[in-house]
Structure formats: structure tokens, C-alpha cells
Amino acid sequence: MPRLLPMTLMLLLAFLPCLARADTCHGQNLIATLPPAQLTELKARAEVPYAHGNLWTATKDGHRITLAGTYHLSDPRFAPILDALAPALATATVLLVEAGPEEEAAIKTRIASDPGLMFLTSGPTLPEQLTPQDWDRLATALKSRGMLPFMAAKMQPWLVTTLLQMPACLFPLAPGADQGLDKQLMAQAAAQHLPIKALEPYDAILGIFGQFTAADQLAMLSQTIAADAQSGDMAATLADSYFAGESHLFYAYSAQAMLALPGMTQAEADRENTLVDRAMIAQRNAAWIPVLEAAAQTGPVLAAFGALHLPGATGVLNLLAKRGWTITPFDPRLTPP
């Protein structure tokens, strides 16, 4: 379930060492391989409000918010996006992100002081909770990422799930592996002495995983283990979809791909997708709206957050539109000086 990755990358990089990369990923875009009829059907399912594009502008009563959907891993394709956003960054009074420098420092401190956030401190270990076959497959997947299996035996299931969503070719993690669009904008903002503020408290992400039962977390881990052979292809598909402005198309594809997992039923896939969407996207979107609107009262705002938060009926763009904001595709030529 690659949708977990953006929300937990910060936690993952706070735990794992960042070393020199040993390889480069060359995955296949799985959406591009679909037969025309299946692609047409997928696109129809993915057609929701504001489904296409990563950069948007919201205006209301003279207030202006530039919204940038982000992808959280480094990629050279960010260069033209950063160039396009330069006028908005130069005129902004604040940069809003999911987690700013203060929040990142706070979560690292919290992790160091509370091992239970990321580790099983009591009860059965993962080898005891998973089937022998799943543990053997997990051990193989971990070894391909340069990790000894015992290192994961007491990790929280959601953390191992997130780890497996990063394909083996990314390991060991390179310095700067997390330099996605948001991090690069933060660096530019800091150089301009522009305030950087968070859309949510540092511990909001911890509350998200509290909404998943232990059984849900184990089920997600088992599904991710079963799909590990395609992790490189899924990562490539996600990146390509993002840079094509089609992140929601990938979201729809990943939901469909769940049905190919062993034992997965439509009812269970729908239940899990609803749970993930509500906990990781919809609830957070609703909580961000007051923060965005309050920031806009003091001047132009540039907000950068995961691209999957933009589209859909419960997406940030539609929620703003329902509150009277005019939503238009971002055009740097129209950014006021």
C-alpha cells in the first residue's frame, strides 16, 4: 500500500541510517502497461474533482493561497516545478508544510524517548504473529534491503509495512533521499528567511496509526509482503504519475491492484481503502482548512503537502471551494509582485 509512504517517510528516516546508495531504481510504470480498455476504465474511476495537476491557486476576498502537491522523495524532475513556484515563494508571507523543522525535531525527540512508538515493547514479536511463510518472505525482503531480519522482529507492523514500500533498489538510503518538493521548498524558504509553519501538530501522524487495530496493521503488512516483488514497479508508477499530474490515477490503480493479492475480496479491499482514506487523507484535509484560511489572513501563502491531499470530494481543493474560495490551476505569470 504505497499510500502509507508519504505519511511515514519522516519517521522512517528518523530511524534508519542514511548511507551511500548502492543502486538506482529502474522500475516499470504499471499503468502504462494496461490494455486500452482497462486504462479507460481506470481513468473513469479516477475522475474526481480536481483530479489533474499538482499546482493550484485559491483566491477569496483578496486573499491568495498557492497550493503545491508534493512527492516526498528526491527526483531531478522537480527542477521546473521549483522554477514555476519561485514567484509564489518570493511573495509568500509563510510556507505551510505537513511538518516543519520544529515538528521534525520534536518527532525525533519523541521517538528517542518513547520506543513503543516504533517498537513492540511487550507481547508477541512479528515472527510470532505472522505465518511462517510470511515471516520467511519478510526476511527475504529485508535482506534485499540490507537489513537483518531480527532488526524487524520487534518493529511495529505499520513501520515494517512502510519500509517495504520503499523498493530494495533505494537501500542503503542515500543522504538527501527525502529531499522531495516540500523539503526543497523548505530549504529555499529558510534561505529567504521566510517563516515555515506546520499544517498539523508533530504528533498528528502518531494518532493516525492509532486508528488502525493490531489486526489491521498485520493484514496490511501481510499484503505488502505478498506484493513486494512489485515494489520497484509501484514506486516508479507512483513517481511517473506524480510528475504527470496524475497522482489520483495512481491512487485508483493501487486500490484496484489490491484485488490481485492472495485471498483479497472486493469487500475487504473497499473496507481497507475506506479506512486508509479516512485516517490518512480525509480527516487531515478537514483539519488543515482552518490553518490555511487563518494563514491567508496575514498575506499570500504557499502551502506544500502530499499531492494525494488535493483531489476528490474530501480533498483540500474541494473543501476550500465549498467555503467560497475560487480554485484555478496555478499560473506563475499571474502571481502578484
Locate predicted features.
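Bacterial N-terminal signal peptides that target proteins for export
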Residues: 1-8
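Nuclease and nuclease-like effector domains acting on nucleic acids or nucleotide cofactors
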Residues: 2, 22-23
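Hydrophobic alpha-helical transmembrane segments of integral membrane proteins
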Residues: 3, 13-14
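Cleavable N-terminal signal peptides
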Residues: 8-10, 20
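N-terminal signal peptide c-region/cleavage motif recognized by signal peptidases
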Residues: 15-19
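Structured, acidic catalytic/metal-binding patches in enzyme active sites
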Residues: 23-47, 52-276
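C-terminal soluble interaction/assembly domains
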Residues: 274-337
